[in-house]
């Protein structure tokens, strides 16, 4: 036979376990995936860029096989390409087509996977051939225009 006191104690434990179970998934849900963190970095690139069109993720290198700590910086390496969407359209990059002969940028740096305090330290270089020069004494070479864009967002 169960006493009222034992029943009350069992009810409290059940309530504590329920609350603990509800709290744990929300804590782990605050960690971004590697891809999500890179997409946020691309969004920051688009926000801070002064160029007329926005960029979209083209290629993402493999994630590092590090620890799963969302607060520790993760090395990232990816390429973005210019889209046909203007900065003024406010359209998500994923809905924009790549621009034919659009600029390509190689981006590297670190991101943290913490959804609330996500940090990005990304450097992007664009490399695009702009002309072929031919001199009588040398083989043709591509002249390259390089520009470095640095993104540092700390929250």
Curated annotation (Swiss-Prot):
Family statement: Belongs to the cathelicidin family.
Domain of life: Eukaryota
Expression sites by tissue: Large granules of neutrophils.
InterPro entries: Cathelicidin-like, Cathelicidin_CS, Cystatin_sf
GO BP, sorted A to Z: antimicrobial humoral immune response mediated by antimicrobial peptide; defense response to Gram-negative bacterium; defense response to Gram-positive bacterium; innate immune response
Keywords, alphabetical: Antibiotic, Antimicrobial, Disulfide bond, Pyrrolidone carboxylic acid, Secreted, Signal
Region forming the signal peptide: 1-29
Residue numbers covered by the propeptide annotation in the UniProt entry: 30-143
Native organism: Bos taurus
Disulfide-bond pairs as recorded: 85-96, 107-124, 146-154
GO molecular function, one term: lipopolysaccharide binding
Protein name: Cathelicidin-1
Organism phylogeny: Eukaryota, Metazoa, Chordata, Craniata, Vertebrata
Annotated Gene Ontology cellular component terms: extracellular space
Protein task: Potent microbicidal activity; active against S.aureus and E.coli.
Pfam family, one: Cathelicidins
